[in-house]
A protein has these predicted regions:
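Active-site entrance/lid segments in N-terminal catalytic domains of soluble metabolic enzymes
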Residues: 1-140
Length: 140
């Protein structure tokens, strides 16, 4: 199989693991896929439900949970790890900011048109942005 590039990242195998929530696409699966040469993906959907120990606030738990999952994945792989953040999430902005601050390699974003996604990146950000486009109309 041929490798492919996303920006300056080279993906050895043309496999991108889907972001499956709630609690399926976490650090274990993402790091395993990344270790095999694909792109491992952590899903943000419902991640705050898995981390109630941080706070009584779901939004805080979501950000802290994503932070922890990214750090756990990084400890298990040197491969490419991304995050799936649905635009439809009420905490979309917070999750995007968290993924960028934790230096996720890629943010995949669908379930809506993420037109403002590039505005979250700073000049020194290395995170790649990959919109999930569901139709030809949306691509236009």
């Amino acid at each position: 199989m041929k490798s492919f590039k996303i920006g300056d990242l080279t993906v050895k195998l043309p496999i991108i693991q889907g972001g499956m929530g709630v609690g399926i696409s976490l650090s274990g699966l993402a790091s395993a896929v990344a270790n095999e040469g694909g792109v491992g993906v952590i899903s943000c959907a419902g991640i705050g439900l898995l981390y109630p120990r941080f706070s009584k606030d779901y939004l805080t738990n979501s950000m802290m949970g994503l932070r922890e999952e990214l750090r756990k994945a990084r400890a298990k792989t040197r491969g490419i790890v991304g995050v799936n953040v649905m635009v439809a999430l009420s905490n979309f902005s917070d999750m995007v900011r968290t993924a960028i601050s934790e230096k996720a390699d890629i943010i995949f974003s669908g379930a809506g048109l993420p037109l403002d996604l590039p505005s979250y990146l700073r000049e020194d950000s290395t995170t790649k942005l990959v919109p999930i486009v569901s139709s030809a109309r949306a691509a236009r």
